[in-house]
């Protein structure tokens, strides 16, 4: 299977940008995860109505960029981790109680 985007390259570029901006200073993984949570809160604000706002996609991108930053900071091969997780999900048996 071919992937047109290298997630590790995106994570690297995000990490470089964070360093350049001075936003990558001795954060613990927990502190970094809490920034993901804050981005999730911002995304939730964009879907409070019946239809998501135009800014919803920006907030989703912010979540992904935060995750890329965490991956880069912690030496995680995020692309392989995502592929491994997707493959593991394929092994799950469907649960009729979950599908509504």
Q: What are the language-model segments listed below?
A:
Residues 1-60, 64-100:
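Flexible "arm" and connector segments at domain edges
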């Amino acid at each position: 299977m071919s992937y047109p985007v290298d997630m590790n390259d995106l994570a690297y570029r995000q990490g470089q940008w964070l360093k350049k901006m001075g936003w990558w200073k001795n954060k613990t993984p927990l502190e970094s995860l809490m920034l993901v949570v804050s981005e999730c809160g911002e995304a939730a604000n964009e879907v409070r109505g019946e239809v998501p706002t135009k800014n919803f996609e920006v907030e989703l991108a912010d979540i992904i960029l935060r995750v890329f930053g965490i991956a880069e900071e912690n030496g995680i091969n995020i692309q392989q981790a995502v592929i491994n997780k997707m493959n593991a999900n394929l092994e799950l048996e469907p649960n009729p109680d979950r599908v509504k």
